[in-house]
Design a protein with these regions (language model features):
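Glycine-rich flavin
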Residues: 1-3, 19-171, 204-208, 213-217, ...
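N-terminal Rossmann-like FAD-binding beta1-loop-alpha1 element of flavoenzymes
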Residues: 3-30, 184-193
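Glycine-rich Rossmann-fold phosphate-binding loop(s) that bind the pyrophosphate
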Residues: 9-12, 35, 178-181
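Intrinsically disordered, low-complexity N-terminal regions enriched in serine/proline/glycine
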Residues: 14, 132-137, 181, 190
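Rossmann-like NAD(P)H-binding beta-loop-alpha module
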Residues: 169-211
Length: 258
């Protein structure tokens, strides 16, 4: 099969490029290895995190209204219902992207693309063999994936990356977030508002490294009251699975602790 334009990757970069090219009159084939369009942002990043942060914010606002003399009972968290609602939000948006692709006559092919020549790809499909496409032009928008840190890869289901954390399989009694960047703080906030005792460890001397310090100060003040602890200038030097939890070794200004 021949495609004038092939776009590899159905995330925000890929589908936007495919839609614009189609609007300009090109025949477009969009290859995405996931079963749905949207990429990391929509499927396991920005959208699910903001959906869960909305839940956390509502819980926080109900609690903070006590200062105004308005009292609500402690919330009862139905984690299965929260997870289901998050997936419905994702499903609605991915369904919308599929309709937009259809309206523009963008051919969406599900599978993993492999270059076999300078203008040829083979798309390997999980249950349907493979297809070969030649093309005139190709846009690479293959995205990224979480980097795995070998020292933290101890084979324990208790150690999660952001993708696993967004699955919201359960809400642990306690949670350590390694990294005080925006992803770590988002996940920490969600789990803290849902009932976990959350601690954050950050290697540098402040949360959100690289962000404007005038913005970080009020944020730090807010999350300090939400989190169990915030350890700055602290490095995680080891993790150990101890059965009913994970033992963590820190190296900070006061030396090494466990």
């Amino acid at each position: 099969m021949h495609a004038p334009l092939v776009v590899l990757g159905g995330g925000p970069g890929g589908y936007a490029a495919a839609f614009m090219a189609a609007d300009l009159g090109m025949e477009v084939t969009l290859v995405e290895k996931d079963t749905r369009l949207g990429g990391t942002c929509l499927l396991r990043g920005c959208i699910p995190s903001k959906a869960l942060l909305h839940v956390g914010r509502v819980v926080a606002e109900a609690r903070e209204m006590q200062d105004w003399g308005v009292h609500f009972p402690a919330p009862k968290i139905d984690i299965d219902a929260v997870r289901s609602r998050k997936e419905k939000v994702i499903g609605a948006l991915t369904g919308g992207l599929a309709q937009l692709a259809k309206r523009r006559n963008v051919e969406v092919v599900q599978g993993q693309a492999i270059f076999t020549a300078s203008n040829t790809i083979e798309v390997v499909q999980k249950d349907a063999g493979s297809q070969t496409f030649t093309f005139d032009h190709c846009i690479l928008a293959s995205g990224s994936r979480p980097a795995r840190i070998p020292a933290f890869d101890i084979g324990s289901p208790r150690v999660m990356d952001s993708t696993a954390a967004l699955q919201l399989e359960d809400v642990p009694d306690s949670l350590l977030v390694i990294g005080g960047g925006y992803i770590g703080l988002e996940m920490g906030t969600v789990y803290a508002e849902l009932g976990s005792q959350v601690s954050v460890v950050e290697l540098t001397d402040g949360l959100l490294p690289g962000a404007d310090r005038d913005l970080v100060k009020p944020l730090h003040k807010r999350v300090k009251g939400l989190f169990e602890a915030i350890r700055l200038n602290t490095k995680v030097v080891g993790l150990k699975d101890v059965g009913n939890g994970v033992e963590v070794s820190f190296e900070g200004p006061d030396g090494e602790t466990t």
